[in-house]
From Swiss-Prot:
CDD domains: MobA. Monomer. Transfers a GMP moiety from GTP to Mo-molybdopterin (Mo-MPT) cofactor (Moco or molybdenum cofactor) to form Mo-molybdopterin guanine dinucleotide (Mo-MGD) cofactor. The gene is mobA. This is Molybdenum cofactor guanylyltransferase.
Length: 197
């Protein structure tokens, strides 16, 4: 039996460091940032969900289901993950941010391999130096635990997953895979890298 894996692209933040611009819609090399992310993950999953708390109509134009946080008040990535976990019947949910246009083309395969090798409930990606808390593969059944954590006032994803059996998938062979865009300067650097990838 093959596993069903869906994905959620997190585009629900305030993007304060980008001057409030909606990061997923910022143009990079002629395409919205989220389009680069979609291109990277679409071949790896069955369904894609987009978590957005503004510009929902614009995000819907990409042809995927758009979900706004069930917990209001821009509570961070956990809120978007909880919402997506409640809208999938998949065995696993891939979580990625909207502003990582160089995500690995084998992201799901390696995260799943880490889960299976470690009998884990979830796997988090690492660039070899640090874990990337918003790049993970997890079981949607963890929604209840994550909801309780968020409703207790907690926000840090790594604090949440530390309470569970988690594995780390290291992508040391792709050191720039998780480079994201938080400032206009980073956007310029990334545009050059995309041209080379």
């Amino acid at each position: 039996m093959s596993l069903q894996i869906d994905a959620v692209i997190l585009a629900g933040g305030m993007a304060r460091r980008m001057g409030g611009d909606d990061k997923g819609l910022v143009e990079l090399n002629g395409k919205a940032m989220i389009e680069h992310t979609i291109e990277r993950i679409k071949p790896q999953v069955k369904e894609i969900l987009i978590n957005a708390n503004r510009n929902q109509t614009r995000y819907a134009e990409f042809g995927f289901t758009v979900l706004s946080d069930e917990h209001t008040g821009f509570l961070g990535p956990l809120a978007g993950m909880i919402t997506a976990m409640g809208h999938t019947q998949a065995d696993y949910l891939l979580v990625v941010p909207c502003d990582c246009p160089l995500l690995p083309r084998d992201l799901v395969a390696r995260l799943l391999a880490a889960i299976e090798a470690n009998d884990a409930e979830l796997a988090v990606a690492s660039d070899g130096e640090r874990e990337q808390p918003v790049v993970m593969l997890l079981k949607p059944s963890l929604r209840e635990s994550m909801t309780a954590f968020l409703e207790a006032g907690e926000r840090k994803i790594d604090f949440w997953y530390a309470k569970h059996r988690f594995a780390v998938a290291a992508f040391t062979d792709q050191p720039n895979a998780f480079v994201n865009v938080n400032t206009p300067e980073q956007k310029q650097r990334l545009a050059a890298e995309i041209n080379q990838s």
